Amino acid sequence: MDMATKIAKKVSEKGGRTFFVGGYVRDELLKIETKDIDIEVHGIDVDCLVDILESLGNVQKIGASFGVFNLKGYDIDIAMPRKEISNGRGHRDFEIYVDPFIGYEQAAIRRDFTINSMMKDVLTGEIIDPFCGIEDLKNKKLKHINDISFCEDPLRVFRAAQFASRFKFEIDKGTIKLCSSMDVSSLAFERVFEELKKALLKSTEPSIFFTSLKEMKQLSFWFKEVEDLIGIEQSKIHHPEGDVFTHSMMVLDEAAKLKDEAENKSSFMLAALCHDFGKISTTKLRKGKLTAYGHEVESVNLAHEFLNRLTNKISLKKEVLNLVKLHMKPNQMYNTSKKKSMMKLWDDAIHPNDLILLAKADSLGRGIDKDYSEIEMALRASLKDYEELMKEPEVSGKDLIELGLKPGVQFSEYIKLGHKLHLSGLSKEDILKHISNNIKKNQDI
């Protein structure tokens, strides 16, 4: 017997009812597998619920003051019906009142969307659907429940865009209008970033997240750089799809098809979003042609500002900026550059595989029906050469000591020189000869 059923049976013995709620019911009806289980207990007081939970395991009071508990070792959140009344502008500025006898409709009214308001009795399977969530699921419609409660949490603007993106649902016009009126500036950046990540990693068309926010006029505060891409024209020869915003959204959707092949899905998808930010300031009409020379350099600067606004994860930012900086090179170099240059490219990339995938998404996201297989084959062959080269022995500190060099500042310089020569294809023996001659020359000076 699973834990939810055990809890529900004991609650029933005390005269209460236990329901699966929120995303669990929604995903079950959509036939989407979910690990997160949320249940809500009605008809018994908090002390009675705590007694029941303590009889079943180690109770973790993750929000005891507002009736939310957890049992150690189980992925299940146990909550009680509650009212949330805003007392400020922030995501957490609420007064919370637990009321286990509030009734099903009043308990559901505090939820954001109709598709998240359904309740399923754990024991009987009965679904209580006071706001027609099942109908909206069938019609692929995302609709808020209550104007007042919805506006109490500005994060719901981004949740609306995220759900629309993940499920390819149409957002109700009334919900769009309401979202357009909400102030999102006080939200904690971590919360906004979490919704962005869900859209990027759980959606097959993450562009819908941004086109939805565009329709709501809610790009400007958190996604200023994305908004600034709108209307930036491109060469119709190379980019028949339209402006830089359109291109970036197409690249993002192409990247979504490839993300499962990426070494780091998060940095890969963020790089796909940020890769052309630099075109905002570098796009110019030169001799009758639209160009954006050096946009990849400026893209790094703007992507850095963008990421700093949304996350403090240093390694993630480093990986994104590395991909953005190098994103042009694979398609520029694959059939024109010397092997040495290609080896340096792969060496400069933190995740060479992801760089190839980004170049592929960038190429395919141009509205041109183009087969990328030949280019990808050439790039992967070159990357394989690099990987084989990296298996060969390189110059170490021990080698330098054997050449008579004492540990110091020069050590790292000679290690770097050895690696550079290794990339050019020299054997370790030849590299050591080169370094030995270099050391002797410096000693003779």
Q: What are these language model-derived features?
A:
Residues 1-445:
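Catalytic cores of the polymerase beta-like nucleotidyltransferase superfamily
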